[in-house]
């Protein structure tokens, strides 16, 4: 952590304030704090938990701000002066600041207050969004307004005064003001003629408002009218009178089909939306008509008379399964481009066959037909025969129909067809059933479904989305994903030679492909076989596809998980046009080809495998990728890599430009080894376990342009780490543990960066932190600088923006605490001394001198206790030769000579007494100069002479010093024991020792004796009888 620290005096606070004020005046900080300035004049204040509209600094150029977004804050009160400084604002978004009770996540009640002139100050305002706020009336609005959204509010009434004066208004959204999520007591009321004064209004949306009829006297300028999901059960010409300019009309969901509803549904009392035959006759400009989810059972051809410009018709989620096969309603819709008939199934029934009505052949302009969820089991040439000759039909959706037999060759006769979606069916192979004639269709077998509530699967899963993006520019694409295919046979694709893109993902294909499965598909360029169980062993796999450019074999892990089974990747060599290959998430780790060879492959996805284990197998797989001579992009994410050796990088293709090592377990990376990849431009190391960027630097001459080391545990970066990478443009250091960002890391290239991402790091926001100046210098290149770059310390600023520093935190904290402590001490002394002198001056004087007198005595006693010359004075009867011999040859030798550094200092009469002194003086000095007095006795019944005198002096020491220093060693355990010995054994057993008669017990005896001589006898007393001598 590199910080520029300054030693500051508290008096410098005013100086610092002046400097900071000057800095703010110069505009070095982001001008729109706490918000973020985005391109095209947008100030983004979303998700900042603001409680009021922010006031920007004087340095902010508010005249250039045209858009302000305040989504998802906590602004409950808007004042007249809130937007005065934004005179040129054109777009204002205030969604989700004070949501109504039903829409609040915790169902809190909230009411937004808007003062009368709040928006009138913005004379150029064109777009205002007040959706998802608890407002009950329309506020006063500027006449310049063009687009207004009042959806999901509590506004229940629109009258002539609500929108008076808004002559420029073109778009009005007021959806969801009264429905199950935002309930009200009745319905939204739009008084007749309330909107008639809006002469330029072209778009009106009133969905989910419990309306029972279309509002009367709407402006004739309307082009888009959306009144779906209300309670309108009847529609006649008078409901749409004078709306001759109408181009799009949505009246769907007003009489719902509840068996297919994904949300609360009320059964329609009319059983079906009642449409007058002439309801739409006068709408000659109508281009889009939505009648979905209206419980329609039949189609009346008169509904569409006069709709000569109708191009989009949505009839989904009705009961039109009979009309689809017999209707004449489509005869005059020659300009219809898109028709949606999905989920018009009969309840609990799956048809054996389906044949479209002959009137479909008149849809000569039809480009897209959606027939998902009609539920029929056989698809043959008669099913769609009236569509085959449509010259413009390019997209056909047949998902979720329970189709189990499909004659795919029929799509080869469609002249303009570009995309067929047969996913999420039950197709298991080529059609084997006898083909029914059109006449047999009416008597087709019906199968009852087990579930009465079939709900559609998501139409756009991530896998299907990626597949569609890859194939959107091809001439012919077919999606057979999520079916029941187990094997692939060439007869399935007869007459489909022009097919260029095919998806067979999410099936159960478990065969060994050998070069014969796709023979008819000579023009196929993209093949998706992900999420299957393919066996890749034959070297001729996919060789029948000479134009194949992209092959997805990901998520075919089952064969690779079979122990002992080998797999062959040599087929890649023979695919001369292949550019993109995915072997991802197959758990490939052993028994595969030791090399991948191809001159054409440019992108290889090998993520989700076991490359870490493969590279650990000696040199067997060291050259696994080296044969891909033209490889540009390699993905090795999630490969359980714990270490990456230089030779691993050295044996990657030199042509490599992108290398992804994301989400592995790398804790070390040899940066100098990047020189082995001279063309590398992008390196992704995110999600690993790097602790620091300190082992070397990026090599000189590298072409690296983007480096991502986010989501690691990086705490430090070595100086000049990035400096030599002169081509570097993007650096991602986010989600690490960095406490600072230092200029020395980058050197001169810092100004060449286009992106420097340091979000989600616990930066230390100390006064003078160097990273603040650096980030301000490159602030346009730092994503989320205003709010995403936050402090991790000190505690007062944790989790807050780096620009939220308190001026008081810029003081030198050590100096501040020192000054505080000294001043506190001075005040305390100044108060306590006079008070004590006044109240108890004499007593303090007496106690002081008393303590002063005791100090030398205490010092002397401690000094004497710490400097006693002997550990034990040994007393024994010299007249007993056996005892004397044991003392000199056993006791002395054991305690003084054989203990090494732990040797005890013994005081012996014949050796240590001073000549010239009396016996009593020597005895006194020996007892008081030793920590313990050790009595060695042969028996305890008769003690006299020196032994008796020594014992009495030891007892005298007990009385004077409160120290029990007596230790008894009895050499004959069977001798008679005196009452004193028996009492001492009861009170202090460890101070009475007996010489063992058996040699194997002598080791324990010496250990017990050492303990008795080195520890205070107070610890040996039996607490049940006595606590031992204590100091007073």
Swiss-Prot record:
Q: Where is the composition biased (Acidic residues)?
A: 437-450
In which tissues is this gene expressed? Answer: Expressed in the basolateral region of gastric epithelial cells with high levels detected in antrum and body mucosa (at protein level). Detected in spleen and stomach at higher levels in C57BL/6 mice than BALB/C.
Gene this protein is translated from:
Tlr9
Q: What is this protein called?
A: Toll-like receptor 9
Q: Which sites does the entry annotate for glycosylation? A: 64, 129, 147, 200, 210, 242, 300, 309, 332, 340, 495, 514, 568, 670, 695, 700, 732, 752
Q: Where is the lipid attached (S-palmitoyl cysteine)?
A: 258, 265
What quaternary structure, including any partners, is listed in this protein's UniProt entry?
Monomer and homodimer. Exists as a monomer in the absence of unmethylated cytidine-phosphate-guanosine (CpG) ligand. Proteolytic processing of an insertion loop (Z-loop) is required for homodimerization upon binding to the unmethylated CpG ligand leading to its activation. Interacts with MYD88 via their respective TIR domains. Interacts with BTK. Interacts (via transmembrane domain) with UNC93B1. Interacts with CD300LH; the interaction may promote full activation of TLR9-triggered innate responses.
Alphabetical keyword list: Cytoplasmic vesicle, Disulfide bond, Endoplasmic reticulum, Endosome, Glycoprotein, Immunity, Inflammatory response, Innate immunity, Leucine-rich repeat, Lipoprotein, Lysosome, Membrane, Palmitate, Receptor, Repeat, Signal, Transmembrane, Transmembrane helix
For the biological process aspect of GO, one term held by this record is:
positive regulation of interleukin-18 production
């Amino acid at each position: 952590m590199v910080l520029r620290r300054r030693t500051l005096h508290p008096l410098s606070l005013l100086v610092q304030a002046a400097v900071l004020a000057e800095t703010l005046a110069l505009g070095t900080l982001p001008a729109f704090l706490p918000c973020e300035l985005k391109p095209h004049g947008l100030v983004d204040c979303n998700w900042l938990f603001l409680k009021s509209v922010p006031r920007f600094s004087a340095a902010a150029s508010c005249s250039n701000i045209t858009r302000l977004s305040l989504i998802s804050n906590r602004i409950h009160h808007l004042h007249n002066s809130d937007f005065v400084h934004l005179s040129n604002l054109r777009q204002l978004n205030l969604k989700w600041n004070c949501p109504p009770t039903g829409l609040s996540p915790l169902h809190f009640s909230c009411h937004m207050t808007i003062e009368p002139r709040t928006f009138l100050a913005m004379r150029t305002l064109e777009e205002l969004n007040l959706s998802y706020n608890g407002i009950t009336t329309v506020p006063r609005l500027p006449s310049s307004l063009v687009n207004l959204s009042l959806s999901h509010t509590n506004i229940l009434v629109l009258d002539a005064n609500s929108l008076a004066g808004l002559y420029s208004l073109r778009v009005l959204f007021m959806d969801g003001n009264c429905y199950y999520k935002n309930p009200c007591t009745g319905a939204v009321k739009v008084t007749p003629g309330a909107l008639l004064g809006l002469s330029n209004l072209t778009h009106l949306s009133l969905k989910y408002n419990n309306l029972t009829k279309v509002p009367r006297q709407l402006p004739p300028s309307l082009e888009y009218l959306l009144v779906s999901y209300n309670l309108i059960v009847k529609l006649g010409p008078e409901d749409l009178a004078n709306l001759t300019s109408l181009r799009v009309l949505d009246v769907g969901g007003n009489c719902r089909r509840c068996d297919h509803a994904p949300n609360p549904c009320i059964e329609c009392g009319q059983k079906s939306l009642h449409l007058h035959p002439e309801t739409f006759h006068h709408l000659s400009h109508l281009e889009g008509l939505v009648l979905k989810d209206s419980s329609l059972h039949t189609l009346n051809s008169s509904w569409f008379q006069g709709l000569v410009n109708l191009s989009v018709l949505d009839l989904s989620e009705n009961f039109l399964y009979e009309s689809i096969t017999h209707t004449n309603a489509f005869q005059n819709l020659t300009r219809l481009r898109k028709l949606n008939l999905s989920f018009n199934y009969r309840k609990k029934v799956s048809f054996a066959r389906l044949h479209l009505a002959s009137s479909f052949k008149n849809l000569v302009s039809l480009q897209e037909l959606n027939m998902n969820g009609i539920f029929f089991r056989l698809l043959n040439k008669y099913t769609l025969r009236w569509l085959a000759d449509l010259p413009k039909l390019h997209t056909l959706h047949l998902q979720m129909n329970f189709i189990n037999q499909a004659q795919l060759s029929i799509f080869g006769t469609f002249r303009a067809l570009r995309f067929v979606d047969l996913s999420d069916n039950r197709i298991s192979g080529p059609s084997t059933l006898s083909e029914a004639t059109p006449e047999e269709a009416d008597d087709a077998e019906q199968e009852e479904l087990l579930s009465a509530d079939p709900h559609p699967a998501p139409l756009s899963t991530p896998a299907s989305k990626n597949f569609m993006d890859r194939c959107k520019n091809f001439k012919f694409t077919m999606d057979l994903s999520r079916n029941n295919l187990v094997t692939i046979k060439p007869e399935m694709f007869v007459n489909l030679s022009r097919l260029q893109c095919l998806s067979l993902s999410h099936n159960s294909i478990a065969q060994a492909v050998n070069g014969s499965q796709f023979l008819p598909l000579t023009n196929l360029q993209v093949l998706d076989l992900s999420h299957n169980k393919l066996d890749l062993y034959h070297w001729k796999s996919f060789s029948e596809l000479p134009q194949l450019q992209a092959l997805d074999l990901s998520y075919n892990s089952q064969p690779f998980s079979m122990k002992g089974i080998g797999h062959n990747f040599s087929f890649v060599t023979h695919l001369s046009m292949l550019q993109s290959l995915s072997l991802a998430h197959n758990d490939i780790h052993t028994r595969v080809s030791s090399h991948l060879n191809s001159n054409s492959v440019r992108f290889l996805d090998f993520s989700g495998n076991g490359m870490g284990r493969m590279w650990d197998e000696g040199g067997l797989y060291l050259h696994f990728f080296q044969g891909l001579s033209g490889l540009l992009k390699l993905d090795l994410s999630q490969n359980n890599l714990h270490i990456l050796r230089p030779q691993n990088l050295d044996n990657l293709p030199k042509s490599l430009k992108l290398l992804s090592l994301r989400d592995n377990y790398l804790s070390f990376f040899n940066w100098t080894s990047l020189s082995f990849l001279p063309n590398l431009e992008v390196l992704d190391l995110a999600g690993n376990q790097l602790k620091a960027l300190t082992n070397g630097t990026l090599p000189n001459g590298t072409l690296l342009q983007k480096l991502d080391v986010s989501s690691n545990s990086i705490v430090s970066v070595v100086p000049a780490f990035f400096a030599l990478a002169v081509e570097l443009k993007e650096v991602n250091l986010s989600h690490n543990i960095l406490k600072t960002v230092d200029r020395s890391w980058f050197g001169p290239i810092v100004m060449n960066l286009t992106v420097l991402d340091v979000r989600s790091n616990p930066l230390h926001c100390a006064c003078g932190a160097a990273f603040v100046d650096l980030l301000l210098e490159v602030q346009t290149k730092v994503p989320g600088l205003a709010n995403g770059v936050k402090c991790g310390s000190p505690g007062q600023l944790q989790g807050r923006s780096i620009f939220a520093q308190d001026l008081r935190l810029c003081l030198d904290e050590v100096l501040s605490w020192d000054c505080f402590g000294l001043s506190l001490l001075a005040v305390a002394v100044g108060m306590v001394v006079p008070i004590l002198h006044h109240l108890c001056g004499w007593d303090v004087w007496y106690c002081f001198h008393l303590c002063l007198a005791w100090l030398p005595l205490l010092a002397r006693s401690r000094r004497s206790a710490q400097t006693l010359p002997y550990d034990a004075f040994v007393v024994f009867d010299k007249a007993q030769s056996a005892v004397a011999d044991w003392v000199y040859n056993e006791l002395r030798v054991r305690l003084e000579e054989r203990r090494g550094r732990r040797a005890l200092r013994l005081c012996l009469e014949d050796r240590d007494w001073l000549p010239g002194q009396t016996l009593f003086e020597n005895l006194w000095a020996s007892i008081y100069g030793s920590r313990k007095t050790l009595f060695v006795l042969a028996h305890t019944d008769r003690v006299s002479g020196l032994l008796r005198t020594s014992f009495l002096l030891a007892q005298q020491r007990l009385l004077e010093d409160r120290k029990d220093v007596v230790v008894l060693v009895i050499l004959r355990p069977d001798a008679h024991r005196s009452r004193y010995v028996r009492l001492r054994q009861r009170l202090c057993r460890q101070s009475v020792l007996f010489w063992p008669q058996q040699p194997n017990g002598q080791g324990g005896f010496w250990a017990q004796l050492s303990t008795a001589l080195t520890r205070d006898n107070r610890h040996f007393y039996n607490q049940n009888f006595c606590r031992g001598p204590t100091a007073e």
